[in-house]
Amino acid sequence: MALLLTTVIALTCLGGFASPGPVPPSTALRELIEELVNITQNQKAPLCNGSMVWSINLTAGVYCAALESLINVSGCSAIEKTQRMLSGFCPHKVSAGQFSSLHVRDTKIEVAQFVKDLLLHLKKLFREGRFN
């Protein structure tokens, strides 16, 4: 019985070494890009019923700004995973109705165009090795 208990304790301790650690930023960005590719390729009907979002400045704080725009789209299951993934990149909590200075407040675009623009920008960041 003592041997069995010792074995269980040893396996439990060693299990911690095999447990997954944090996802590297390059992997997380690649997964986000893959998700955006899936969204743009599988588009049969207007994405999110043609909902409009604020255009964003893609040169700084792109993840939080993108999340702030997309968080205001409700009832669109196609972008829910993207919203969750973007929240992993954003260091602060983003809630609906929140606006940052990174929005171009005079310009609204369709979610589909927003996703395409974001995808192109994230691919560029990935090629340049800028993961954060």
UniProtKB/Swiss-Prot annotation:
Domain of life where this protein originates: Eukaryota
SUPFAM superfamilies associated with the record: 4-helical cytokines (SSF47266)
Segments crossing the lipid bilayer: none
Keywords from the UniProt entry: Cytokine, Disulfide bond, Glycoprotein, Secreted, Signal
Pfam families cross-referenced by the UniProt entry: IL13 (PF03487)
Cellular localization per UniProt: Secreted
Positions of disulphide bridges: C48-C76, C64-C90
Listed InterPro entries: 4_helix_cytokine-like_core, IL-13, IL-4/IL-13, IL-4/IL-13_CS
Positions annotated as glycosylated: N38, N49, N57, N72
Gene3D superfamilies xrefs: 1.20.1250.10
Signal peptide start and end residues: 1-18
GO terms for cellular component: extracellular space
GO molecular-function term, one example from the UniProt record: interleukin-13 receptor binding
Record carries keyword Hydrolase: no
Function: Cytokine that plays important roles in allergic inflammation and immune response to parasite infection. Synergizes with IL2 in regulating interferon-gamma synthesis. Stimulates B-cell proliferation, and activation of eosinophils, basophils, and mast cells. Plays an important role in controlling IL33 activity by modulating the production of transmembrane and soluble forms of interleukin-1 receptor-like 1/IL1RL1.
Similarity annotation: Belongs to the IL-4/IL-13 family.
Summary of subunit composition and partner proteins: Interacts with IL13RA2.
Name recorded for this polypeptide: Interleukin-13
The organism of origin for this protein: Pan troglodytes (Chimpanzee)
